[in-house]
């Protein structure tokens, strides 16, 4: 066959440019894969624990699967430029300059995405112990002016940005050097047209199509391939920043879709959850139960104050983690005097999700700023108290517009919603922050409301939500408590967490403790129930695999006046979660009132086979003293929970005992969907 120099036929320029693009993008993909591999190693050594190295097979599987994801996503990003250059080869006029510029820009964009999203994913894992997910998108609802100070408060933020700039510049420089060298080599290549089609087009496209799928089997790489181990630290290595962002966005979009709830689905869930079939009557009311009749409660309804505290981690209240320093402030004595449940889990690792789960019994966190924001839900905690004759008040240290909380919770039965703007009007001395105001003043405001009702004209149900212990961890000027020299065992755990977070943690706990002391030192002591828990644990600390439940745990504190206590002494060491708070408060404060039957009264004895004898967290299910980690909606092999809330190193060899808890999330979703669908149906009626 006649051999033709590519510079000899009329498509010469386009052919040369195609080869330049193919070889340059190949080098670019190899370079980006190396960068992502180094990012994984950095994540492993920065955040994973030495004990995890024993899982060597899983580690290599994670690195290999991650490499496959890297190749697949990089090829998919680069394929447009390659295909465009192939299409231009037979063109009778040169498009070389345009195609080359477009691919040059595409390559630069890929480099920037790879490096900066790798750092974002690295930092996200350090703070949340998981790759970028839907929270990164739902958090945008807070606004850039709120999010940016929070992001910049991450440990060594400037160093991370500087490293990204240096690596980006070095990558651009290296790619330019390689491109110039490749161009010189290509000009010397001689190839016949058939050889060119086979070796320069057909074979590369075949390789690209295989690597772009990430697999030669029937199924290409997908979401399910992100789980390669029962070890969270190992699974965190699999997705690169681009993949994590992609699946996070898909999850975020999916969370906004609320499908209609069918009666058949509800009945199947009812039987799976409660262990017996529903009757033929209307299904929705059967998900409710009633508190016991009590003449005493009817004649003496107590005030109920539920405090939801930002990032109130239980670990920092334990000397096993914090050392010999008191991070509870004045709250410490109340933890000793009253009920303190120390093996307790939040519903989620996110304020908004925990908030709507606890107060509205829904898993749709975006509901407060969705088209369903005005739909009143019967599963709302405020509505249960209103039905019992209570005045309902929400006092929030943050801005009212965050996630549309003011409007939404008023739609869910709160008579009054007081946020940072109103608090600033009432208390001019209050300093503002990116999130709102200072926690001290929500407790002052709650006490004022309770004082006005000291004679008991109408009982109050009050919910508070603090914000001070949130990045960027700005301690209010009124915060006079100081932490003595911090123990090394605690400082060693602060991987991405600034030391200032310990000051704000102490500040809020102390303010809560002072509020409880004021109640106990007043006539309100006899008729005010006080509960407190964390919306989620503190994030960014270092924990090993055996400490995963400690990593997410929050305390549940409960003060009950003597006259309202039962003779039964509750087990404060039982494993419980957010789902059990409201049933406990309902049964302690209310007589003959219907409420969603979704949790247990922690002050009553509980049998092992009880429907509600499990603890629920979005990522964990604890049932029968075994903890099951959820990863991509898959329940992994359980680990035994020790009395100190530590997990065994190895998974349990016993059969899974998931109990009723595995249906809990689906039940919450069905209840919300049913109510929204019912409301829409009523609206459509003439």
Go through each PLM region and give its residues.
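Transmembrane and membrane-interface helices of multi-pass
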Residues: 2-257
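Generic alpha-helical secondary structure signal
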Residues: 4, 16, 20, 57-58, ...
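General structural signal for secondary-structure boundaries
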Residues: 51-58, 128-136, 149-156, 257-269, ...
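Residues that form generic nucleotide/phosphate-binding pockets
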Residues: 66, 70, 149-150, 173, ...
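The feature marks either
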Residues: 231, 238, 243, 247-292, ...
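Solvent-exposed soluble domains appended to multi-pass membrane proteins
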Residues: 275-686
